[in-house]
Amino acid sequence: MKYLAAYLLLVQGGNAAPSAADIKAVVESVGAEVDEARINELLSSLEGKGSLEEIIAEGQKKFATVPTGGASSAAAGAAGAAAGGDAAEEEKEEEAKEESDDDMGFGLFD
């Protein structure tokens, strides 16, 4: 991810085709370790893909087809909230019992 971020920074900075050395320099400038094999893998995967805008647009199309599962997570959230409410009531009862046990007629400053 850090190599992709460095690539994007270089492109936004005006370098239309960043090299491995350019990416390495950006990553090293922040004190991060560099894996040149990963940089070369990134550059080879981006080679021939077109402009950065085209790559982002293609990725957005792919994400649009992925189901998010929002309905199932909403149902799980509601069930969790109901269970959480019961736990809160039990906790209040336990606190009340503990408070009555602590007060045995002894005052702190007596």
Swiss-Prot record:
UniProt KW Iron keyword: no
Bias (Acidic residues): 87-104
GO cellular component: cytosol; cytosolic large ribosomal subunit; fungal-type vacuole
Processing and modification events after translation: The N-terminus is not modified.
Alphabetized InterPro entries for the sequence: P1/P2_N_sf, Ribosomal_P1/P2, Ribosomal_P2
GO-annotated molecular function: molecular function inhibitor activity; protein kinase activator activity; structural constituent of ribosome
Keyword Ribonucleoprotein: yes
Miscellaneous notes: The 4 small acidic ribosomal P-proteins from yeast can be classified into two couples of similar but not identical sequences. Each couple (P1A/P1B and P2A/P2B) is distinctly related to one of the two acidic ribosomal P-proteins P1/P2 present in multicellular organisms. Present with 602000 molecules/cell in log phase SD medium.
Family that this chain belongs to: Belongs to the eukaryotic ribosomal protein P1/P2 family.
Subunit structure: Component of the large ribosomal subunit (LSU). Mature yeast ribosomes consist of a small (40S) and a large (60S) subunit. The 40S small subunit contains 1 molecule of ribosomal RNA (18S rRNA) and 33 different proteins (encoded by 57 genes). The large 60S subunit contains 3 rRNA molecules (25S, 5.8S and 5S rRNA) and 46 different proteins (encoded by 81 genes). The 5 acidic ribosomal P-proteins form the stalk structure of the 60S subunit. They are organized as a pentameric complex in which uL10/P0 interacts with 2 heterodimers, P1A-P2B and P1B-P2A.
Protein's recorded name: Large ribosomal subunit protein P2B
Source organism per UniProt: Saccharomyces cerevisiae (strain ATCC 204508 / S288c) (Baker's yeast)
